[in-house]
Regions:
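Glycine-/small-residue-rich "gating" segment that lines the acyl/pantetheine channel
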Residues: 124-131, 169-172, 176, 192-248, ...
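Active-site-proximal alpha-helical scaffold in enzymes
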Residues: 77-90, 140-144, 148-192, 230-251, ...
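ACP-dependent fatty acid/polyketide chain-elongation machinery
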Residues: 1-66, 244-256, 352-366, 410-415
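Condensing-enzyme catalytic core mediating Claisen C-C bond formation in acyl metabolism
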Residues: 4-8, 31-35, 214-290, 298-299, ...
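A glycine- and small-aliphatic-rich helix-loop capping segment at beta-alpha/alpha-beta transitions
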Residues: 21-26, 112-127, 177-180, 200-213, ...
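Acyl-CoA/ACP chain-elongation machinery
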Residues: 182-227, 260-274, 304-311, 328-379
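Phosphate/pyrophosphate-binding loops at sites that engage ATP/ADP/AMP, CoA/4′-phosphopantetheine
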Residues: 84-97, 246-253, 283-299, 321-326
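Conserved beta-ketoacyl condensing-enzyme motif
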Residues: 7, 20-23, 28-163, 191-200, ...
């Protein structure tokens, strides 16, 4: 028997705040989380701005001894998982069978800070000075591994790595595992901490990042003057739980996950297919599985990276999948205009935005939107949040390698 799947816990560390509620409140207020890069000296760099996490001290949160052995990416993930577990009520002994609790938390690049630091150590001091913790701190599965250890989660584990679609796929695969009975609940999401010289230089070299130095206008998804994305960092972890299990224990339910689409463009390593066939098919798969009725109060949290190619291609894909009439009635926005592009964490934090939007009837805006682009002709909720009677939500994400993910959600109404 297939299970329905609920979202019962949310945790976030983001450029907008170090909790899920702070992040959501900032989204609704149209707050920009982008500012001058402080993690390193940008004098030699064309890129000057990023969406950094602010006020998070790993030494204070974990203690200096433990923090020293955790890459910042993993620190963000573990903090978000703590909040999600507490929010779901799973931090209480006996609340869930730990052999039925899984962890699907990924990262686009993993512990890149650790890798680069140790490369410099080899160059400066020789190979014998490399940390014995380097490998365990660097590999992308360690967010999932450390979360499982921390919360004694002994169920299925699946660290996902699909670039910018990572945590969307993690949420989708967790949904599938619970739907088909492999777990009662799964911590699903992603984390990233790659605002470092090497990553910024690499993304700049492939012409993905904006060189606009003004934080207030640097990230402007769907605007005609957009010219690249802004690097972000942080983590978001959701507790997905079978509806039966959640209702039996009286859990708070934010929304129901009802569909998932996973496709690949098979087109190019970094550029999206201009025909948008892959993302359109992912949306269609999610909508079909969830029996979504797009004309009945739909919010779409678009990938909306603020790059020329993505935003026009994604717009075409949304229209191709849902049809012109349904899309014209839908509310669309890109919360990346506020969070920046959190890479491996972006899918989960955008599913969070969908769940909160459904529960509270508020559509977060696309800020910095001023000049319409004829190729991007939907209602992108410009600059201010709006109230709306929502029944359905879609979160779409695309990653380097042609990876596409779409997650469909439904507003939860206790029957």
């Amino acid at each position: 028997m297939e299970q329905r799947v609920a979202i019962t816990g949310i945790g976030a560390v983001s450029p907008l705040g170090n909790t899920a509620l702070a992040t959501w409140a900032a989204m609704c207020a149209g707050t920009c989380g982008i500012g001058p890069i402080t993690h390193f000296d940008t004098d030699a760099f064309a890129v000057k701005v990023a969406a950094e996490v602010k006020g998070f001290d790993g030494n204070e949160y974990f203690g200096k001894r433990d923090a020293k052995h955790l890459d910042p990416c993993v620190q963000f993930a573990m903090a978000a998982s703590d909040e999600a577990m507490h929010d779901a009520g799973f931090d209480v002994e006996g609340a869930i069978d730990r052999e039925r609790l899984g962890v699907y938390v990924g990262s686009g690049v993993g512990g890149m800070t650790t890798l680069v630091d140790n490369v410099h150590t080899i160059a400066d001091r020789g190979p014998r000075r490399v940390s014995p913790y380097m490998i365990a701190m660097m590999i992308p599965n360690m967010a999932s591994g450390n979360i499982a250890i921390r919360h004694k989660a002994k169920g299925p584990t699946l660290p996902v790595v699909t670039a910018c679609a990572t945590s969307a796929h993690a949420v989708g695969e967790a949904f599938r595992a619970i739907k088909h009975g492999y777990a009662d609940a799964i911590l699903a999401g992603g984390a990233e901490a790659a605002i470092i010289p090497d990553a910024v230089a690499g993304f700049t070299s492939c012409r993905a990042l904006t060189t606009n130095p003004d934080p207030a206008t640097a990230c402007r998804p769907f605007d005609a003057d957009r010219d690249g994305f802004v690097m972000g960092e942080g983590a978001c972890v959701l507790v997905l739980e079978s509806m039966e299990h959640a209702q039996a224990r009286g859990a708070h339910i934010y929304a129901e996950v009802v569909g998932y689409g996973n496709t690949d463009d098979a087109y190019h390593i970094t550029s999206p297919d201009p025909e948008a066939a892959g993302i359109a098919r992912a949306i269609s798969l999610a909508v079909t599985e969830g029996d979504v009725k797009p004309s009945e109060g739909l919010y779409i949290n678009a990938h909306g990276t603020s790059t020329k190619l993505n935003d026009s291609s994604e717009t075409a894909g949304i229209k191709r999948a849902l049809g012109e009439d349904a899309v014209r009635a839908a509310h669309v926005s890109s919360t990346k205009s506020m969070t920046g592009h959190m890479i491996g964490a972006t899918g989960a934090i955008e599913v969070m935005a969908c769940a909160m939007a459904l529960e509270q009837g508020v559509v977060p805006p696309t800020i910095n939107y001023h000049t319409p682009d004829p190729a991007c002709d939907l209602d992108y909720t410009p600059n201010r949040a709006v109230r709306a009677d929502l029944t359905w939500a879609l979160s779409t994400n695309l990653g380097f390698g042609g990876h596409n993910a779409a997650i469909a959600l439904r507003r939860y109404t206790r029957s």
